[in-house]
């Protein structure tokens, strides 16, 4: 028994699998929460990086490029340890779950920023010229002309990164977060049966990946690709 759960270890593998399912589902909820929060942070921070990286002012664009490269070239676990162990030394303390989600978001923001930048650069330059001829300010041109056409182009890539974030959530177990894989390990440690819980986690991840990929394809097919009319 652990965390209020009891496991049936004496009536066969099926009974054991059914008895551990509630704890794995609790781990699944934690996994999804961390993944979606991390994805949200990555999308927002990635857009900030993309805008800064695309500026013509070198003293803004170059530091942004260096920071993006630094984030991409350092391991997720190193960034996680920095947030969890180093920041508290300076009085900056976050709960373990939030720390994990932030680490995921920061790591993937560097990749997503390049996805955004590619989508923005793919928009026909004539769209910018047309907005300029209408005397639209740069900020409104970006939010009303460029982004509505750039975002639909990058939906498939964003979906792929969401799936990748889900599969990276188990790294957060090093800061005591009991996500799905860590829950399976705990069950295995207590029952000496690792095959069943780990196999179940693998199956759940497979289902998650298939469902997420299908949803991304549906959104990509049904999302308008030509943006929205100017107002």
Swiss-Prot record:
TM annotation in the entry: 9-29, 32-52, 64-84, 86-106, 161-181, 196-216
Matching InterPro entries, A to Z? Answer: AA_ABC_transptr_permease_3TM, ArtM/GltK/GlnP/TcyL/YhdX-like, Ectoine_EhuD, MetI-like, MetI-like_sf
Keyword tags? Amino-acid transport, Cell inner membrane, Cell membrane, Membrane, Plasmid, Transmembrane, Transmembrane helix, Transport
Q: One of this protein's Pfam families, by short name? A: BPD_transp_1
Q: Which GO terms describe its molecular function?
A: transmembrane transporter activity
Membrane topology annotation = Multi-pass membrane protein
Q: Does the keyword Repeat apply?
A: no
The superkingdom listed in its UniProt entry is Bacteria
One cellular component GO annotation, for this chain's record?
A: ATP-binding cassette (ABC) transporter complex
Q: Where in the cell is it found?
A: Cell inner membrane
Domain spans labelled ABC transmembrane type-1: 28-217
- GO terms under biological process: amino acid transport
What function is annotated for this protein?
Probably part of the binding-protein-dependent transport system y4tEFGH for an amino acid. Probably responsible for the translocation of the substrate across the membrane.
Return the similarity comment. Belongs to the binding-protein-dependent transport system permease family. HisMQ subfamily.
The protein's name is: Probable amino-acid ABC transporter permease protein y4tG
Q: Which organism is it from?
A: Sinorhizobium fredii (strain NBRC 101917 / NGR234)
């Amino acid at each position: 028994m652990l965390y209020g759960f009891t496991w049936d270890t004496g009536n066969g593998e099926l009974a054991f699998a059914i008895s551990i399912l509630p704890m794995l589902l609790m781990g699944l909820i934690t996994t999804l929460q961390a993944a979606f929060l991390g994805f949200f942070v990555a999308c927002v921070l990635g857009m900030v990086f993309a805008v800064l990286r695309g500026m013509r002012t070198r003293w803004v664009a170059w530091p942004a490029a260096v920071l993006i490269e630094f984030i991409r070239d350092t391991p997720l676990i190193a960034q996680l340890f920095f947030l969890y162990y180093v920041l508290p030394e300076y009085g900056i303390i976050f709960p373990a779950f939030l720390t994990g989600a932030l680490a995921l978001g920061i790591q993937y923001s560097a990749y997503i920023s390049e996805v955004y930048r590619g989508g923005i650069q793919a928009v026909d330059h004539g769209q910018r010229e047309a907005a300029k001829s209408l005397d639209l300010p740069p900020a409104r041109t970006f939010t009303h002309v460029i982004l509505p056409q750039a975002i639909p182009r990058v939906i498939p890539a964003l979906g792929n990164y969401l799936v990748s974030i889900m599969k990276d959530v188990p790294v957060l177990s090093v800061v005591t977060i009991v996500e799905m894989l860590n829950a399976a390990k705990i069950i295995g440690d207590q029952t000496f049966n690792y095959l069943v819980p780990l196999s179940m986690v693998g199956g759940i991840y497979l289902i998650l990946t298939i469902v997420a990929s299908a949803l991304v394809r549906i959104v990509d097919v049904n999302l308008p690709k030509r943006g929205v009319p100017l107002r």
